[in-house]
Amino acid sequence: MNPEDLSVLIKNTAAAVLTEHELDASVLPETVTVERPRNPEHGDYATNLALQVAKKAGAQPRELAQWLADALAGNDAIDEASIAGPGFLNIRLAAAAQGAIVAQVLNAGADFGSNTTYQGKKINLEFVSANPTGPIHLGGTRWAAVGDSLGRVLEASGAEVTREYYFNDHGGQIDRFARSLVAAAKGEPTPEDGYGGGYIKEIAQGVLEQNPGALDGSDAEVQEAFRSAGVEMMFAQIKESLHEFGVDFDVYFHENSLFESGAVEKSIQKLKDNGKLYEAEGAWWLKSTEYGDDKDRVVIKSDGNAAYIAGDIAYVADKFDRGHDLAIYMLGADHHGYIARLRASAQALGYDPDAVEVLIGQMVNLVRDGKAVKMSKRAGTVITLDDLVEAIGVDGARYSLVRSSVDSSLDIDLGLWASQSADNPVYYVQYGHARICSILRKAAELGFDTAALADAPLDLLTHDKEGDLIRTLGEFPEVVATAATLREPHRIARYAEELAAVFHRFYDQCQVLPKAGEETEPIHSARLALASATRQVMSNALTTVGVSAPEKM
């Protein structure tokens, strides 16, 4: 019995006892909260339900708690239910009910942890969306790791997720990129507002190799030749870097398509027709202050050209017109102002503003030997995704970026994350997984049927450390659901670290396999089943954050 099952049992029991005493059962919460008590001696789980609803129902807290304890004591899954303090209820599970969690994990396999929180929901998840003017920097790398992991968490919670990359190929930054390429191809200095770094020279050379006559023609023709070919080459490199990082997108959405298809013009006309725009100072303004923005936004500038927000307006409309129920934008620390304007744009167009979510990620800093690492050899300016992977590997890079909340800035110690020690969190978890795989291989050599461990006598698992490990396994589905609801995939990584620690404590005190010359006992099969279930959940957790689960290390 996992916490979710226990929550349902307690709620059903509470409804029955309240009805039996002719009291109002409608005061019960939708979900009863059950927690692990700080002191394990108090039981396996605890709930404050009686304190929460007794007075509303017309009873005293301890009185209701006693009714619950008496009723629960008659359930085969409950070994003991006792009252503490003003009405807390402590619960100890029967050994068979506790062991059933192990069988549940083994039978569910890779699906253990999945839930239906977002069943039937279509979610558009936009992340990275770096300009195609240079390699992905550390901020974009953080979003690549966190965004892909969040997509996995949402999918594990039943959602249909579209991973989307917004390709910014419309605007002045592309012109500056093209001018930088032309200058590099001619051997001239980088323009004052241009892009520098070795990658510019590489792409410029690539354009010339592809089109030896790229520098021939008028200035406009040369600019366009380097613009189109250069952007294509740069974006191909970005895609390759992301793919090697384990991140692929379902949709690469081109900003230019919004203008070329008439979507921008259509959205603006809709806003005009509905009275959501007004003309002032020769420009057209969105009445965004009516929807919580701090100021109205220019949509059409006085020169007749569309402002940047015009593309945003058409893009949010496109996302919902494609049938998405929720649009999540993952943006950098300098995009706080986008939250209100995106929600305002959606509401002005007639969509639910609460269906627009903006997650803001903070900066990432690299440290080596206590000193900041600031320069990329290739980019010439900032550290890139490829630099980080080269330093600590894909698994180290992804895990280091996903294990912390994006609300705070992050320092990555390259020496720590490259080390093969228990101080390295990803190594610690992966080592735990590999260690269990080694145990299972040894068990097979000893004649254990490792494919039938769900049938082991799991009610023999009564040691304190066995109980700690089983209860930790049982928490995984709730951790996944919470990570999805709060958009916090770092909870999965932290859980994996806790699970590894709890397993190591179990393994230190509970002999899993018989020693040489010892007879095989039923407890060995039960503990082997527990170890196998732990391996499965470790694998599921690592997979959910996009990190490998090696069988050997």
From Swiss-Prot:
Which of the seven top EC classes does this enzyme belong to? ligase
User: Biological process GO annotation list?
Assistant: arginyl-tRNA aminoacylation
GO CC terms: cytoplasm
Q: Which UniProt keywords apply?
A: Aminoacyl-tRNA synthetase, ATP-binding, Cytoplasm, Ligase, Nucleotide-binding, Protein biosynthesis
Q: Give start-end ranges for motif 'HIGH' region.
A: 130-140
State the EC number(s).
Answer: 6.1.1.19
Q: What is its main location?
A: cytoplasm
Q: Cross-referenced PROSITE patterns, in alphabetical order? A: AA_TRNA_LIGASE_I
Q: Which InterPro entries does the entry mention? A: aa-tRNA-synth_I_CS, Arg-tRNA-ligase, Arg-tRNA-synth_N, Arg-tRNA-synth_N_sf, ArgRS_core, DALR_anticod-bd, Rossmann-like_a/b/a_fold, tRNAsynth_Ia_anticodon-bd
Write down the Pfam families for this protein, in alphabetical order.
Answer: Arg_tRNA_synt_N (PF03485), DALR_1 (PF05746), tRNA-synt_1d (PF00750)
The record's subcellular locations are: Cytoplasm
| Reaction equations catalysed | tRNA(Arg) + L-arginine + ATP = L-arginyl-tRNA(Arg) + AMP + diphosphate
For this protein, what is any one GO molecular function term? Answer: ATP binding
Q: How does it assemble?
A: Monomer.
Family recorded in the similarity comment: Belongs to the class-I aminoacyl-tRNA synthetase family.
Q: What is this protein called?
A: Arginine--tRNA ligase
Give the lineage.
Answer: Bacteria, Bacillati, Actinomycetota, Actinomycetes, Mycobacteriales
Its gene name is argS
